[in-house]
Amino acid sequence: MVKIGVLGLQGAVREHVKSVEASGAEAVVVKRIEQLEEIDGLILPGGESTTMRRLIDKYAFMEPLRTFAKSGKPMFGTCAGMILLAKTLIGYDEAHIGAMDITVERNAFGRQKDSFEAALSIKGVGEDFVGVFIRAPYVVNVADNVEVLSTHGDRMVAVRQGPFLAASFHPELTDDHRVTAYFVEMVKEAKMKKVV
């Protein structure tokens, strides 16, 4: 069984844990840097990205997270987690973890009152996934090596680049665990490759 960490500094941590467990993997709430060595994949939950960055800096997680990404272990960022994974952020000089060749705009779908749900077709997941968008970012631009898994209107809302997965929406806030199960499969595949 693969062990998937959920960064436990802020956001919908409990909901991600429940979704990971429902997808047949072991979930670990990561609150200490040394826990990164014990896991096969990591979820960066949604929340408020500037608050998340402050907490990451306060607890000295940034370099260990970048090292985790460089090791090739899978990472899945939802909402604010997508912002953390992006190499380029509109209106900001520097990236956070910067593992994905994507350009992201924060709060691109509007403020809290503009939050909404939408039926999404997600490549490798299904045609009828309900995406929950809360002050959601979206992907403005991708490099050629990034696969677009889903769009809402003309906006890219789910992308994959090798071991990295990012979504504008909150899959953990529904009872549909297919997106988390997709990530669990990514983690299993990556772990199998390491063993071979």
From Swiss-Prot:
Please name the catalytic residues of this protein: C79, H170, E172
Name the job this protein performs.
Answer: Catalyzes the hydrolysis of glutamine to glutamate and ammonia as part of the biosynthesis of pyridoxal 5'-phosphate. The resulting ammonia molecule is channeled to the active site of PdxS.
Instruction: Name the family the entry cites.
Output: Belongs to the glutaminase PdxT/SNO family.
**Annotated protein name in UniProt:** Pyridoxal 5'-phosphate synthase subunit PdxT
Tell me which HAMAP family the record gives. Answer: PdxT
Query: What subunit structure does UniProt give?
Result: In the presence of PdxS, forms a dodecamer of heterodimers. Only shows activity in the heterodimer.
The EC number on file is: 4.3.3.6, 3.5.1.2
UniProt pathway: Cofactor biosynthesis; pyridoxal 5'-phosphate biosynthesis
**Species this chain originates from:** Bacillus cereus (strain AH187)
Q: Which GO terms describe its biological process?
A: glutamine catabolic process; pyridoxal phosphate biosynthetic process; pyridoxine metabolic process
Q: Key word Membrane present in the record?
A: no
Top-level lineage group:
Bacteria
**Looking at the UniProt record for this protein, which Gene Ontology cellular component terms does it annotate, in alphabetical order?**
cytosol; glutaminase complex
Q: Name one Pfam family in it.
A: SNO
- Which molecular function terms from Gene Ontology are attached? glutaminase activity; pyridoxal 5'-phosphate synthase (glutamine hydrolysing) activity
